[in-house]
């Protein structure tokens, strides 16, 4: 009987995790961004492990990360590892980007406030590729609304961006300044340096193709 109960609990856990991952990621590929699949080349990965291991403190003290650096240095993968690891612990995480959020807001049948409130209900919100969205007045206003609502919810936020810390600390105008100020107040900046993993992956694919064509 105990074995049956344990198996049932295990099944329930797996169903819960599967559901969290289905609802939490905008792209199914993100489910593969795990510590187990890590290539070991990102020196910052121990900071991701630290975040997951100390999740209760991070949540209570509203500590987020601002992951910045050049394209392809592993920022999104790093954030995905945190998301997957917390989902495995049955913590609801939403990992999305502002292009998707702005599309959702335009197409959404529910009100704008309700949509943003729903985003802010997730214990952890991850915004990938911040700064890549269209910089219209409407777009910037919605970006601010989401960041500000998250700030007021006192729940942590993790952001990945190709923008430099200098450009975030010295914005060009007021519209960007109020967004960046909020981000820097909520998130500890972490610089990603090193080789471009995407370029390396592309090179590996090319080498494999050459092998196959021999």
Regions found by a protein language model. Name each.
Residues 62-66, 93, 124, 156:
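Residue-level preference for the first positions of well-ordered beta-strands
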Residues 47-59:
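Pre-Walker A adenine-sensing motif
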Residues 59-79:
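Walker A/P-loop nucleotide-binding motif
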Residues 1-45, 200-214:
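A short, basic N-terminal segment
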Residues 72, 131-132:
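Catalytic acidic motif of RecA-like/P-loop NTPases
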Residues 44-49, 83-124, 134-141:
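Short glycine-rich substrate-engagement loop in P-loop NTPases that contacts/grips substrate
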